[in-house]
UniProtKB/Swiss-Prot annotation:
Protein name: Diaminopimelate epimerase
Stated role: Catalyzes the stereoinversion of LL-2,6-diaminopimelate (L,L-DAP) to meso-diaminopimelate (meso-DAP), a precursor of L-lysine and an essential component of the bacterial peptidoglycan.
GO biological process, one term: lysine biosynthetic process via diaminopimelate
Subunit structure and binding partners: Homodimer.
Pathway(s) per entry: Amino-acid biosynthesis; L-lysine biosynthesis via DAP pathway; DL-2,6-diaminopimelate from LL-2,6-diaminopimelate: step 1/1
Compartment annotation: Cytoplasm
GO molecular function, one term: diaminopimelate epimerase activity
GO cellular component terms given for this protein: cytosol
Reactions catalysed: (2S,6S)-2,6-diaminopimelate = meso-2,6-diaminopimelate
The species this protein was found in: Aliivibrio salmonicida (strain LFI1238) (Vibrio salmonicida (strain LFI1238))
InterPro entries listed in its UniProt record: DAP_epimerase_AS, DAP_epimerase_DapF
Length: 276
């Protein structure tokens, strides 16, 4: 059988996006891994699948699979690409789109300048909601990673994140400490590991080692998590520019009890057809 797909990216975090409203495809973990192979397949960080809404109050259901075949709860860069895809393919003409995910609902808004703003919901700091092994919520935790003790924050943006403030993120050994944090025993479902350099109270530099995908050019939910942790640690203001290897995002959060908003681009690269 064959199916149609689009290749897209959000600041270099790249996706294969498939409409499963008009096509019936089962993506097994093995098939996803083969498609994600950058030498023998299409190559991508995540597979995004558009499905019919599970909830009558939503427009679509949004599924995300990492390149290792695991299904995950959230992908902020993917959400922006999802919004552009469903409009580009004529699946909706709405500028505000409500989608359900594995762990909740999200509102996606197409701005006048073609940027996409995603309501990411309220950051969750309770350890059992992340999940993270701790007796109570703290602004900072100590995490042992081989020869280092990391001072980090833990938060869920619909998916788990661990954020560590570092002095020089460009030269930080993300290849070493990313996997150590991702698979740390205190995160029973593994975790996305973010490493944040504070440039000013309104700007950070960030690198993210994503759970199941490795370091990516950009991680939208990771940018949200970093700003949320920075605000809780009283290091950042409520409107922050996040500079990632692939480009910049704007994150706005007014603090506990309020939703967090992410604004950034979504780029269509090409459309294709595959036989499987």
């Amino acid at each position: 059988m064959h199916f149609h797909f689009s290749k897209m990216h959000g600041l270099g975090n790249d996706f294969m996006v498939v409409d499963c409203l008009t096509q019936n495809i089962f993506f097994s973990p093995d098939l996803i891994r083969r498609l994600a192979d950058r030498n023998r397949g299409i190559g991508f960080d995540q597979l995004l699948v558009v499905e019919a809404p599970y909830d009558p109050e939503t427009d679509f259901h949004y599924r995300i699979f990492n390149s290792d075949g695991t299904e995950v709860e959230q992908c902020g860069n993917g959400a922006r690409c999802f919004a552009r895809f469903v409009r580009m393919k004529g699946l909706t003409n709405r500028t505000t789109i409500l989608v359900s995910t594995k762990k909740g609902k999200m509102s996606l808004k197409v701005e006048d300048d073609d940027q996409i703003t995603v309501n990411m919901g309220e950051p969750q700091f309770e350890p059992n909601k992340i999940p993270f092994k701790a007796t109570q919520a703290e602004k900072t935790y100590l995490l042992r990673a081989e020869d280092k003790t990391l001072f980090c924050g833990a938060v869920s943006m619909g998916n788990p994140h661990c954020v560590t403030v570092v002095d020089d993120v460009d030269n930080y050994d993300v290849d070493k400490y990313g996997p150590l944090v991702e698979g740390h025993e205190r995160f029973p479902e593994r975790v996305n590991a973010g490493f944040m350099e504070i440039v000013s109270p309104s700007e950070i530099k960030l690198r993210v080692y994503e759970r199941g995908a490795g370091e990516t050019q950009a991680c939208g939910s990771g940018a949200c998590a970093a700003v949320a942790v920075g605000i809780m640690q009283e290091l950042l203001e409520e409107d922050v520019k996040v500079s990632l290897p692939g480009g910049d995002l704007r994150i706005v959060w007014q603090g506990p009890g309020k939703p967090l908003f992410m604004t950034g681009p979504a780029t269509h690269v090409y459309d294709g057809q595959l036989s499987i």
